[in-house]
C-alpha cells in the first residue's frame, strides 16, 4: 500500500498503524503520530487502520543539551 510518510512516498505491507510503525523502524522509539492532520493518542495505534494515500507525519524526540 502506498502512503505519504513525513512528506515522502512509502510502500508498506500492513494496514494496522502499529504494524506500519514497526515496519518503518519506529518500534521502541518515542514519537508522535499525525494521521491526515490529526494527532493520534498512543492508545489508538493498535486500532487505527491505514488506507492508501493516507498522510502520516511521525515526529521523533531527540535529547540533547
Task: Identify the role of each PLM range.
Residues 1-64:
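Ubiquitin-like/PB1-type beta-grasp interaction modules and other compact soluble beta-rich domains
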